[in-house]
Amino acid sequence: MSLLTEVETLTRNGWECRCSDSSDPLVVAASIIGILHLILWILDRLFFKCIYRRFKYGLKRGPSTEGVPESMREEYRQEQQNAVDVDDGHFVNIELE
């Protein structure tokens, strides 16, 4: 069974195009999948930076501090801040929440 929906054949009058029955369920399903794939590809290209930045940075919210005493949380924040505050002339201070 062929998935071709359009066939060009040589006739006496020249080249003609004979289309097969487009109500074939396989042809309809392939068309729908093709259109959805094209739409998703276009959206991916348009929103590439937003989507992948969200996956890369948005889902990483750092280690959980649930059940950790406040003093240890503050110590962790201070360590993170010290790692950033190497040289105030070249680095921007980042306030951790």
From Swiss-Prot:
Forms a proton-selective ion channel that is necessary for the efficient release of the viral genome during virus entry. After attaching to the cell surface, the virion enters the cell by endocytosis. Acidification of the endosome triggers M2 ion channel activity. The record marks H37 as: Essential for channel activity, possibly by being protonated during channel activation, and by forming the channel gate and the selective filter. The modification Phosphoserine is found at S64. Keywords: Disulfide bond, Host cell membrane, Host membrane, Host-virus interaction, Hydrogen ion transport, Inhibition of host autophagy by virus, Ion channel, Ion transport, Lipoprotein, Membrane, Palmitate, Phosphoprotein, Signal-anchor, Transmembrane, Transmembrane helix, Transport, Viral ion channel, Virion. One of its GO terms (cellular component) is membrane. It comes from the Viruses. Residues 61-80 are annotated as: Disordered. Cytoplasmic tail plays an important role in virion assembly and morphogenesis. A lipid is attached at C50 (S-palmitoyl cysteine). It is found in: Virion membrane; Host apical cell membrane. This is Matrix protein 2. The M2 protein from most influenza A strains is inhibited by amantadine and rimantadine, resulting in viral uncoating incapacity. Emergence of amantadine-resistant variants is usually rapid. HAMAP family: INFV_M2 (MF_04069). Residues 1-22 are virion surface. The record marks W41 as: Seems to be involved in pH gating. It holds the Pfam family Flu_M2. GO terms for biological process: protein complex oligomerization; symbiont genome entry into host cell via pore formation in plasma membrane; symbiont-mediated suppression of host autophagy. It comes from Influenza A virus (strain A/Chicken/Hong Kong/37.4/2002 H5N1 genotype X2).
